[in-house]
């Protein structure tokens, strides 16, 4: 079935738009028929007085379900008794098993008051959540619940945003309504929705609260007039579907969250190399020239990307026949593959409404969104008038698979290695109400005019094929009443309660929220925030359909909770400003550690506006210490490829040299997160959870457990005041010990091509003996081990290796390293042949043997030439 555009009147009895103050008079609910056992609790909730109908009609009868799912997780669900109210579909967010937990073993305790109904969640008698702050409201188009918080709480999460890592607790609003957020402005809703917050309470532990609800929502964090701290949910629909989870520290809490939304997808080895892109490469010759220039500059380029420039008039699944002809594109991709490099292009969701294959086939299969009268729902984006795929349509995956397998066919098409999906909030340039997308497209020059055609490259590109050298010469869908799909009679376009959407009305610059999707009949009003994540999962499946044996890399702009199961995320259309250089750290940390989307990074050097040599040099270093490392900028701005400026080129070479030597450390840690949820990129407080000085740090971070990154934060600076917790660290470059005492240390004379790095004591890091121009070449290099003893003189680390690409591995290497009392112990699973460990470097003071070589008295290196094939012990002192 297809979608329809419904203009529905509000439910009978609903009041006109009220105010937040009106809700304080609502009666709340009374609990009755309470049934309780060791594993669960159920109850009926009945409206406790006269309906207030503030932003819709109060629902009289609700249900309460409480499940002690595990010792660390509690599920609390409040929903309508008839189960007609919309709930997030299980196909989007698969539900975790109810588990075998019990109230007597659980670290979390549920308690309630019958009238007015409220509940608390406690951990060891400490109140974590207390909904008695105000009466519960459950209306047809408005849900409200407020919880008390402790004074001056340390809260994190509630993404996507570009605010500080630690959330403000005064007059702060987080709005969930995915939008095309050019410029990624602070204090506004951005591309993704992650309705989870973490509350870190130092020694007593960390807990999280995840609300499984995809409706538009405001979350307020503020104080009452008498100074009491609270957090308040205000949603446009859905139900209260809470998951409370706890850990003794923030890292454990993040692991618990991964058990709810799913573990992140493992990525291929090559994806951790350097990526280069730009919106505005004029033709295939310029793309080839960029590849050549990177090689000439000695800067390792792993993957070349192309934005929508490659398309014929910006139409998806098409090639510009003059600027990106098929035969030249196949030659370009062939060249990259022959040189162990990779290629990625962008695909947007919107399909041009014109005589083209992708549109005609989609129209024939009836997989696009439609209006109530059976006509095609149309918007306007880059190609002009567009149709939108309906990700709920039962045939959409077949359509998407077919388009991918045809256009990206290895034998006849553009054989891409990964995928970039954009504009999937979904974006619509045509303002609401978009009554004439044809006129809007015409008046706004959509699609934009392409650049002049060139018949060949303007200069020789040695090594490229001869062609790259300079030339010598109808039906409608009515709404069906089903369980958990949504109440009838709601105003899906202008709900009484107005969330603080930066774009204005719900439908402005996006798909009309009155659309009803195919299949079960979900409304866009309820599922808007799922559009990008549904495109993500369909695109991952389509990539896997054409290459079923390998891990598909898909990078998306729009996300919802759990998106990391399928995709990685880049942080959107930022600016080439120092402010955005800095905020990329906090935003990236939130995605990687708190939202379980670990493949993440910003547009290095900035997307919008002209970057500067200094900013780009610093950012080239910083970007190397994210998992996803891509230089990308906008059409019309100056070029910012790393080779453009000598200092930027040098900064990139130095940073990539370190990154590539660390690539197996990165790969090992990323694999661990894909298996257990243990974060790789981490805020400082994740490793020092009892040091309150670390709780607000978001300009330093840990690259895995072992490496502290302390970037220079601003223009013109050559020093940074870096915080060192009470621990031992070692300078990455010199091995010099740095004894932290829980205070800042000023690091001075930091060259523009340098980024301060310190190894955390207690770590063993496997590195490659040298860098390489590609990750394929890198995998042939031998290993070295760096041992950085902790304050107790011990250290540990691990190494995971596989073939680097396959979904199913035939053999792996999983090695554990331990150093204690002068002896290195190596144990594990040795199925896969690995390169030799040519040397072991021991940092810190110590007595060396006859094979030891000292450097400034701070480290010694022992040549080993050890084969990682069996358990081994090596005496180092």
From Swiss-Prot:
Keywords: Carbohydrate metabolism, Cell wall biogenesis/degradation, Glycoprotein, Glycosidase, Hydrolase, Polysaccharide degradation, Secreted, Signal. It catalyses: Hydrolysis of terminal, non-reducing (1->4)-linked alpha-D-glucose residues with release of alpha-D-glucose; Hydrolysis of terminal, non-reducing beta-D-glucosyl residues with release of beta-D-glucose. One of its GO terms (biological process) is cell wall organization. The keyword Hydrolase applies. Residues 447-463 have a biased composition (Pro residues). Glycans are attached at residues 171, 293, 373, 508, 574, 610, 744. It is an enzyme of class 3 (hydrolase). SUPFAM superfamilies: (Trans)glycosidases (SSF51445), Galactose mutarotase-like (SSF74650), Glycosyl hydrolase domain (SSF51011). It is found in: Secreted. GO terms for molecular function: alpha-1,4-glucosidase activity; beta-glucosidase activity; carbohydrate binding. Gene3D superfamilies: Glycosidases, glycosyl hydrolase (family 31), Golgi alpha-mannosidase II. GO terms for cellular component: extracellular region. The active site is at residues 422, 425, 573. Its EC number is 3.2.1.20, 3.2.1.21. Residues 432-476 are annotated as: Disordered. InterPro entries: Gal_mutarotase_sf_dom (IPR011013), Glyco_hydro_31_AS (IPR030458), Glyco_hydro_31_C (IPR048395), Glyco_hydro_31_N_dom (IPR025887), Glyco_hydro_31_TIM (IPR000322), Glyco_hydro_b (IPR013780), Glycoside_hydrolase_SF (IPR017853). The keyword Ligase does not apply. Residues 1-14 form the signal peptide. Belongs to the glycosyl hydrolase 31 family. Glucosidase involved in the degradation of cellulosic biomass. Has both alpha- and beta-glucosidase activity. This is Probable alpha/beta-glucosidase agdC. It comes from Aspergillus oryzae (strain ATCC 42149 / RIB 40). The lineage of its organism: Eukaryota, Fungi, Dikarya, Ascomycota, Pezizomycotina.
